[in-house]
């Protein structure tokens, strides 16, 4: 069972997608995201398996919520630096978590 101390280890922040493109090299369909997390964290990239509901062009300027303190992972040669969070209503289906009102990039989630 997880305890509050486990949750407090996560650095969860808001960011704005500034670039998105298809990622055909990925084993599972995905989109490469470039996300602005503000001056403290900066620009980070992520591979997100969100192709069932989203197209790259529709993601630009969308705010998302991500864990920013996991170690980077290499996915088909691409360095994924953050884990973008979403709800999973079904197999292969992800709905991005977003603030319901705009907040500054880098805002902590707790």
Swiss-Prot record:
One of its GO terms (molecular function) is tRNA binding. CDD domains: tRNA_bind_CsaA. This is Probable chaperone CsaA. Can suppress growth and secretion defects in E.coli secA and secB mutants. Probably a molecular chaperone for exported proteins or may act by stabilizing the SecA protein. Signal peptide: none annotated. Residues 6-110 form the tRNA-binding domain. Induction: Present in exponentially growing cells (at protein level). InterPro entries: CsaA, NA-bd_OB-fold, tRNA-bd_dom, Tyrosine-tRNA_ligase_regulator. GO terms for biological process: protein transport.
């Amino acid at each position: 069972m997880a305890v509050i101390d486990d949750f407090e280890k996560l650095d969860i922040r808001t960011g704005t997608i500034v670039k998105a493109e298809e990622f055909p090299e990925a084993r599972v369909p995905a989109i490469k995201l470039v996300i602005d997390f503000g001056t403290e964290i900066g620009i980070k990239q992520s591979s997100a398996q969100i192709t069932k509901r989203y197209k790259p062009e529709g993601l630009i300027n969308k705010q998302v919520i991500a864990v920013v303190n996991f170690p980077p992972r290499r996915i088909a040669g691409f360095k994924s630096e953050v884990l973008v969070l979403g709800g999973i209503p079904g197999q292969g289906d992800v709905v991005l978590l977003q603030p319901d009102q705009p907040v500054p990039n880098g805002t902590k989630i707790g």
